Design a protein with these regions (language model features):
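Generic detection of long, well-ordered alpha-helical segments
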Residues: 1-4, 88, 138, 142, ...
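A cross-family signal for N-terminal binding/gating loops and helix N-caps
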Residues: 1-109, 113-115, 248, 264-268, ...
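Basic, nucleic-acid-binding surfaces and adjacent catalytic neighborhoods in DNA/RNA-processing proteins
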Residues: 22-41, 54, 147-274
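Phosphate/anion-contacting hairpin/loop surfaces
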Residues: 66, 70-171, 176-183, 191
Length: 274
């Protein structure tokens, strides 16, 4: 599943390529995505200009000139492709095609169809069921040790799973919390209320640093992820623990272990992380 760095990379590509463009027509496949397409989807897009791109957690927000927003979530295997000169060629698993007046096109492709697209008015954003319960962005200044201490007070859940809860902080996916916990020398099994203030401070710094480095490298590509131009990310070559079960720890040479937590794989060094 694309995590925050991957979605941010896509948003930056959209910003470079579609701002100011006019939508002239759209096409939808006959197969629904995770949810049915909203009513009058195609008509709501027609003749609209793209004025802004933003991101909230793992959601892509394409703002139009009538104060409506095209909201996209990539799900597990979704990707957006941009074509400078589109030749009407559809490929397997294309589900949304948005054509612009200069003959360029934005195409949503999704093998497993776990992603979705919706259209909402900007006034509905705060109450939208997908967006309303989202907490702080991890790269924001407000995501600090004082905030996190309050959120974790009395919580006995393990620190790894709780840091992936959107009601604590958004967008810190499985890859990046594994890497951040390793750098912070915190075991993913440790109860959240047992993590000391100085450890939380280190964890926050590492989350911010890891996410920023991943963004700078275009995200991580494990299977399907690619950016708007079809290029893969490169941060996977910097993984210290994620996906490295039974390989030597880069710091102490102890074998990296993998356990299952809440249905997800956790990778850690039992010697370095306590």
């Amino acid at each position: 599943m694309p995590e925050l760095p991957e979605v941010e990379t896509v948003c930056r590509g959209l910003q470079e390529n579609i701002i100011g463009k006019k939508i002239v027509k759209s096409w939808l496949s006959e197969k629904n995505l995770r949810f049915p397409y909203p009513e009058n989807f195609i008509n709501k897009l027609k003749n609209r200009y793209i004025v802004q791109i933003s991101r909230r957690a793992r959601y892509i927000l394409i703002h139009m000139d009538n104060q409506e927003i095209l909201l996209i979530h990539l799900g597990m295997t979704g990707k957006l492709n941009f074509y400078q000169n589109y030749d009407n060629h559809k490929i397997k698993h294309d589900h949304i095609i948005i054509r612009f007046s200069d003959n360029s096109a934005l195409i949503y492709n999704d093998v497993r169809r776990f992603g979705f697209a919706d259209i909402l008015h900007i006034s509905e954003q705060a109450d939208n069921k997908m967006l309303k319960d989202l907490e702080l962005e991890p790269l924001s200044e407000d995501f600090n040790v004082q905030y996190l201490q309050k959120k974790l007070a009395g919580k006995k859940m393990n620190i790894k799973n709780i840091m992936m809860d959107n009601k604590i902080v958004v967008g810190v996916g499985n890859i990046y919390i594994n890497e951040s916990l390793f750098l912070s020398r915190i075991s993913p099994k440790k109860s959240a209320n047992e993590v000391k203030k100085e450890e939380l401070d280190m964890l926050i710094k590492n989350i911010k640093n890891i996410l920023q480095k991943a963004i700078n490298k275009g995200g991580s590509t494990l299977r399907d992820y690619q950016n708007l131009d079809g290029d893969v990310g490169n941060f996977q070559f910097d993984f210290r623990v994620y996906g490295r079960e039974d390989k030597n720890c880069v710091d102490c040479k102890t074998k990296i272990q993998r356990i299952r937590q809440n249905g997800r794989s956790s990778f850690f060094c039992p010697s370095c992380q306590r």
